[in-house]
Amino acid sequence: MAWIQLKIDTDNQHAEQLSDMLMELGSLSITYEDGKDTPIYEPNLGETPLWSHTVITALFEADYDLAPVVEMLKLQPYLGADFSHKIEQVEDKDWEREWMDNFHPIQFGRRLWICPSWREVPDPEAVNVMLDPGLAFGTGTHPTTALCLEWLDGLDLQGKEAIDFGCGSGILAVAALKLGAAKVTGIDIDYQAIDASKANAERNQVADKLDLYLPEDQPADLKAEVLVANILAGPLRELAPLIAEKVQPGGLLALSGLLKEQADEISQHYAQWFDMDAPVHKEDWSRLTGRRK
């Protein structure tokens, strides 16, 4: 089955109003795109921010008459009679197959591979983490996740205990266990992340070595030799004392989820507890590492 889509240029002040109107006029779905490559990094809790220049795509059935829709939109004062829009035919595809074809095994560091379950493992002798993309959690493709995986690959984790602070999909926790850690504790504020981490640990046969907690349930005396936190700069700053007290003296720390321009400030903040290393960058993102004093 083919489809037809209507693309409209608008701004963030009118995007939701326009979306509601398009749905009332028969659209089957609405998507938002950034019209000018303007990044949004850290929205406030409960906010769904949109770009100042937003492109709305409304999908309709192929035989739907869009002429009345366009005429109705021309009457809206925030668009005007000459509003920017485009109508395109969209061929139906096996979207699931196309989505799966876009994911390939990825190597991080020297030993570690992240592999989708439907792909053949490139190196059976390597440390292979089987992880399928799903939900809004890390799969290794984001620079911050990659930075943390590369750091873990470079450590001697044999027999050590680690903490994955903000575990998300559990990718870092599972990788640490596959790299030799004796035990990992994963902490996250989202119960969906706890479920995702558990499922991924089971898929990789390491669930018996992974303890998972919501913050309010974690042991009061929790400490480890290694802690990795791939969250955002704001929480990293606010939770610094809590994170620091979870790392044993001489233990190792890795922080990511922060932008290049945020790295120096966060590093200085943690320097009261850790001997901090120089930041490592990948694209616009940074990783900070240090050793507990």
UniProtKB/Swiss-Prot annotation:
It is found in: Cytoplasm. The keyword S-adenosyl-L-methionine applies. Signal peptide: none annotated. SUPFAM superfamilies: S-adenosyl-L-methionine-dependent methyltransferases. GO terms for cellular component: cytosol. The keyword Transferase applies. InterPro entries: Ribosomal_L11_MeTrfase_PrmA, Ribosomal_PrmA_MeTrfase, SAM-dependent_MTases_sf. HAMAP family: Methyltr_PrmA (MF_00735). Methylates ribosomal protein L11. This is Ribosomal protein L11 methyltransferase. It comes from Shewanella loihica (strain ATCC BAA-1088 / PV-4).
